[in-house]
Amino acid sequence: MNLTPRTLAACLLSCAMTTAWSADKIKVGFLATASGGPTTGPSKDVRAGFDLAIKQLGGKLGGLPVEVVAGDDQASPDVGKQAFDRMVKRDKIDVVTGVVASGVIYAIAPQAAQQQVFFVNSNVGPRDFVADKCNAFYFNTGWHIESVNEALGKYLATLGLKKIFVIAAGVPVGREHIEAFKRTYGAPLAGEIYYKPQTLDFSAELAQIRAAKPDAVYAFAFGPLSANFVKQYAQAGLKDIPLFGPAPLADEDSIPAGGDAMIGVTTAGHWNFDLAHDTNKKFVAAFQKEYGKDATLASEQGYTTAMALDAAVKAVGGKIEDKQAFRKALENVSFEAPRGPFKFNVDHSPVQNIYLRKVFKSDKGDLVNRTQKMIAAGHSVRGASSCSM
C-alpha cells in the first residue's frame, strides 16, 4: 500500500494514543532564521509578536505554562529538518511554529506529519499542503499565496487594466504567486518574467517592461529585493506605471529601505497597522509599548498564532496529548485577531479578510502604508472543500 503524506498523517492521527490527564506544560518549538539573510528580520518580528501574546496571556497557552524551544533553520531546508528533528527527539515539542523561509516550510511539513507534531505555519503557505493535499498536522495562521494573489487579480480585473506585466523570482514560490494572480485576473498579459534569485541589477527586466508599455505591473519580491526592485523601477522612469503586488513588496521593512520610490506602490495583504477595530488598536499600542517600534505584518502573524494555540489548548482543557481532540480544537478556533475575524477552513488554511494598502508620504514626511479598502471578505484558498480529512 502506498501512503501519501496526507493519508499517512490521517492514519497516524487516528492511531495516536490519548490520555485522561492533562499535560503540565506545552512545549513550542520556535524554528526561525537567526543567522542572517532576508528571512531574519521577519523571523524576529514573528517571535516578537508571539512573545507579546504569551506575555499578555500570563506566560501560558490555554492555561498551560509555555516552554519555547528556539532553533535556527539558517533559511536552509536541510538545516531546518535537522533542527526540527532535534526538537522532536530531544526536546519533545508538541507544536512547531515560527518558520519564515519557504524552503524550510516545504521541508518540514511532511516531516511534522510523520512525527505527529503540529506545524502551525505562521507565515506564507504554499499550495502543497492545502485543498486536496491537506495535512492533519498542518495549520496556517499566516496567509496563503493563492488567497492574497487571487483576491488582488480579481480586484485589478475590475479596474479595467487590460495589459498587466508580471514579474517574480524564478523559484517555486514566485511561480505560485504569478499563477494565482493570473487565474483571477483573466486578461492576456503584457509580459511575464522570472528573475534569478538574489538578482541585484534589474535593468534587463525593466527594459522589457518599458518596451511592453503595460497599463500596470504586478511584482513579487520580499526583503531587501523589494526595496531594490522598487528603487530601480523608479530610476528607470517607470514610476507613472502603477505597481502592484502582495504584501511583502511594500511592507514595514522594505518601505523605509525603498524611500520615496515606494510612494504609490499598492499591495494586498491580510493586515495593516491602521485597521480601525479595537483588537488591532490594542495590539499596535501594546507592541509599540513593549518594543518601542511599530508592529509589522510578521509580528501580527506571530501574535495571532499564539492566540489560536491559546484557544485550542483551552478548548481541550489542557489535554494536548489527545492529538485528535487538539486537532479538532484547532480546526474550530474562531476569534477576532488584529487582522479581523480569523478561523480555519476545512483544509486548515486561514479564512480572513484581504485589504488593499497603498504607500503615501504623510504631512510629517513619513512614508506610511494606508489601508484603502477591503477587497475580499472571509477569503480562503480555492478548492478547500476537496480536503478529505
Language-model features, listed with the residues they occupy:
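Bacterial N-terminal signal peptides that target proteins for export
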Residues: 1-9
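Sec/Tat signal peptide C-region and signal peptidase I cleavage site
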Residues: 18-22
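Beta-alpha junction/loop-to-helix N-cap segments that form part of ligand/metal-binding clefts
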Residues: 25, 41-46, 56, 60-129, ...
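Solvent-exposed, acidic/polar segments of extracytosolic/periplasmic ligand-binding ectodomains
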Residues: 26, 331-389
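Extracytoplasmic "Venus flytrap"
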Residues: 29-51, 71-78, 100-101, 167-175, ...
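Periplasmic-binding protein-like
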Residues: 30, 87, 91-100, 120-122, ...
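Extracytoplasmic ligand/sensor domains, especially the bilobed periplasmic-binding protein
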Residues: 93-193, 242-266
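Extracellular/periplasmic periplasmic-binding protein-like sensory domains
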Residues: 230-303, 314-320, 369-389
